[in-house]
Amino acid sequence: MGARWWLCCFPKETSAHRPHSSPSSDPLPHPTSSAPPAGPPFVSIPSAAAGSTKEMGAKLPYAHVDARLRALAGQAEGFGRHAIGGLHGPVYHVTSLADDGPGSLREACRIREPLWIIFEISGTIHLSSYLRVSSYKTIDGRGQRIKLIGKGLQLKECEHIIICNLEFEGGRGHDVDGIQIKPKSRHIWIDRCSLRDYDDGLIDITRESTDITVSRCYFSMHDKTMLIGADSSHITDRCIRVTIHHCFFDGTRQRHPRLRFGRVHLYNNYTRNWGIYAVCASVEAQILSQCNIYEAGQKKVVFKYMPEKAADREEATSGWIRKCFQCLGTLPNMDYGASICGSQRGSPVMHRMASITKTSRLVVPPKSLCVAAVIGYK
């Protein structure tokens, strides 16, 4: 199975180079002719009649989104659905693979205005330190193959970030994650990225960061894959809300994810051959797992409960995981309403655990529905 089945690659735009272009709708070629294969079996894509290229293109994931550059904004499913990235800013063209300097990705990410960042070249960017991303940015790797190595992206006290079609590999150093989201960041969408082999996590979401969607990403060659919620002393992480869907966890050892305090919705993910467990619920975690495939290797524990004591509680708890392996229709209830965190709500944050089963209903589009199972587990 190819590691890049989920990435949409387009021919390079033919417009002349410019550091910024106007925020008008910059067209990309229609994805029909260069669309990726359907991918692993858990992605449910209707078949088209032989020779019906136009019909097939319309049914591939994101066909309506990838036809034009800025159509991606606001198209996430789940808690990160409001992320608009650099929708209202100019287009920034990355022309250099250098760590810093004119035309580099780092220069674009530090600019304090909305930007839609695209790449004029393919290649590897060696990061000597975390690349901090400021608010209202889209880092759009469609059309090129961009790999970040050495360090990762840091989303610190920012909002409205879209990260699409990038590779992350070989991050080295203490507390080095592929994508580190902390503190107090929100409205984030990570889509169609490949992450592997970092010294710490691949994606870590902690310290009051919320309203985040991770979709159609590929995770491999790693231990502590995805941590959500810092530790049992950070009770303000009760506001965290994350959706993870259509992701492939391929032989990663643990944390798919591991959750403390917050709420996580998992659907249409494929996790196989983990090394310790698949999903872990720690202190006050609330996890809704729907239509996922868990294919065990030598280790058979899928859902692990790890009790911890919150700093403001007397007894240790492990939270809960609600499992649904067949859901062909409207999904059970998940609260996708407003989230209030930290200073936005007042201090201290002391709200009760919200019920997933008694709130508003989420209807996942038909392209997202499938029947899933747990294979060889206990």
Would you name each region that the model predicts?
Residues 71-117:
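Acidic Gly/Asp/Thr-rich repetitive segments characteristic of extracellular carbohydrate-active
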Residues 1-18:
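PEST-like, low-complexity acidic/proline-rich intrinsically disordered segments
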Residues 27-62, 258-378:
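Extracellular beta-rich repeat passengers
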Residues 98, 122-124, 144-145:
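Acidic glycine-/aspartate-rich tracts in secreted/extracellular proteins
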Residues 136, 141-142, 159-170, 185-200, ...:
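Right-handed parallel beta-helix
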Residues 106-113, 124-138, 147-164, 170-184:
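Extracellular beta-strand-rich solenoid/capping regions of secreted or surface-exposed proteins
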